[in-house]
From Swiss-Prot:
GO molecular function: protease binding
The entry's keywords: Cell adhesion, Endosome, Lipoprotein, Membrane, Palmitate
Name the record gives this protein: Flotillin-2a
Compartments it resides in: Membrane; Endosome
Superkingdom assignment: Eukaryota
A GO cellular-component term linked to this record: endosome
Subunit structure, interactors included: Heterooligomer; Heterooligomerizes with ic complex of flotillins 1 and 2.
Keyword Lipoprotein: yes
Family label: Belongs to the band 7/mec-2 family. Flotillin subfamily.
PTM section of the record: Palmitoylation may be required for the formation of higher order complexes and for neurite outgrowth in cultured neural stem cells.
Gene name per UniProt: flot2a
Lipidation (S-palmitoyl cysteine): C4, C19, C20
Length: 428
């Protein structure tokens, strides 16, 4: 059987041998691979960046000046399968330190060879170009090892014989000399130029003064013209302002008048509305109640009038009905009386003296009542007589006078009625 092996992205897994034969190799970067026991070999190689510090001491340049150069290089194993195979052939099984040592020696060799072809000034003054040249020369050799140079820079350049400092001093002296000469020439040129400038300045000043005077005169003339024009414009502006102000004032007054007219109209409208409101209020509070009261009184009067009319009509109808009833009653009574009289007349005619006697007897109580009416107010009657027989005589006398009175009243002669004859004449 076998095992499964894994590596991170900073390492490459190299699998060799196995079922694929003795020449079969596989490279796995940041992954996994299967390996058979006993017949498969598993190894790892780092892909991390390696920092190298190549240093070449006392290397003679093209001018024979011994200098020391130090640099910094960043290198790593390339991941292309072919180049990774080259790296595995060269460094598989070696430590990182051993790999760094091989690459460092290669870079230092190329650095020495390049230093011999350049001057100190070229190396010192153009370090970037020098580093680029080293990188271009060393890249093919380390590339055949499967190594890539990511960067190469010159860290320091110095020497033990003070060549660089002397070079700097000579250059400094030359620069100082050139500076002094330049200062002297500048001062000379400055003096000459100053004199020329003074002359030019005087000429220019004279011309300037002349021009200034002319300019001043023209300025004064222009000022006068400007002042005149300004005053004219001011007067015109003032006049225009006053006219405009008068117009604006007139507009304002017109606006005020219009506002007053509008206010008056509104006031009149308000007063008219107030009058209408007052009228409505008076109508509602006085006229309507008065009209209602008048209508009420009118209705009451009309009702009373109607009541009186109806009452009068009812009374008249009542009187009419009563009159009609009384007339009917009287008519009926009259008819009854007439019928009674007719019947009585017939009876009288039929019965003769007997009927007359009945009439007399019927009328006697009434006559007696009428005669005795004055006596109704008399409590008692006392007859004074010394002789007891005299009273009887008085009664007889009254009875004897009664027929005469009845005859005078009714026309009936009671003396001819047998019954009364017996009553008035007891001796017979």
């Amino acid at each position: 059987m076998g095992n499964c092996y894994t590596v991170g992205p900073n390492e490459a897994l190299v699998v060799s041998g196995g079922c694929c034969g003795s020449d079969g190799k596989t490279y796995t970067v940041g992954g996994w691979a299967w390996a058979w026991w006993l017949i498969t070999d598993i190894q790892k190689i780092t892909l991390e960046i390696m920092t190298l510090q190549p240093k070449c001491e006392d290397v003679e340049t093209a001018e024979g000046v011994a200098i020391t150069v130090t640099g910094v290089a960043q290198v790593k194993v390339m991941t292309d399968n072919e180049l990774l195979g080259y790296a595995c052939e060269q460094f598989l099984g070696k430590t990182v330190t051993e790999i760094k040592s091989v690459i460092l020696q290669t870079l230092e060799g190329h650095l020495r060879s390049i230093l011999g072809t350049l001057t100190v000034e070229q190396i010192y003054q153009d370090r970037d170009q020098f580093a680029k040249l080293v990188r271009e020369v060393a890249a093919p050799d380390v590339g055949r090892m499967g190594i890539e140079i990511l960067s190469f820079t010159i860290k320091d350049v110095y020497d033990k014989v003070d060549y660089l400092s002397s070079l700097g001093k000579s250059q400094t002296a030359a620069v100082q000399r050139d500076a002094d000469i330049g200062v002297a020439e500048a001062e000379r040129d400055a003096g000459i130029r100053e004199a020329e400038c003074k002359k030019e300045m005087m000429d220019i000043k004279f011309q300037a003064d002349t021009k200034m005077a002319d300019s001043k005169r023209e300025l004064e003339m222009q000022k006068a013209a400007f002042n005149q024009e300004v005053n004219t414009k001011k007067a015109e502006a003032q006049l225009a302002y006053e006219l405009q102000a008068a117009k604006e004032q007139q507009k304002i007054r017109l606006e005020e008048i219009e506002i007053e007219v509008v206010q008056r109209k509104k006031q009149i409208s308000i007063e008219e509305k107030e009058i209408l409101r007052t009228d409505k209020e008076l109508i509602a509070t006085v006229r309507r109640p008065a009209e209602a009261e008048a209508f009420k009184m009118e209705q009451l009067a009309e009702a009373k009038k109607i009541k009186k009319v109806l009452t009068a009509q009812a009374e008249a109808e009542k009187i009419k009905r009563i009159g009609e009833a009384e007339a009917g009653s009287i008519e009926a009574v009259g008819k009854a009386e007439a019928e009674k009289m007719r019947l009585k007349a017939e009876a009288y005619q039929q019965y003769g003296e007997a009927a007359k006697t009945a009439l007399v007897l019927e009328a006697l109580p009434k006559i007696a009542g009428k005669v005795a009416a004055p006596l109704g107010r008399t409590n008692e009657i006392v007859i004074l007589s010394g002789d007891g027989g005299r009273v009887t005589g008085e009664v007889n006398r009254l009875l004897a006078e009664l027929p005469v009175s009845v005859n005078a009243l009714t026309g009936v002669d009671l003396s001819k009625i047998p019954l009364l004859q017996k009553m008035t004449n007891p001796q017979a």
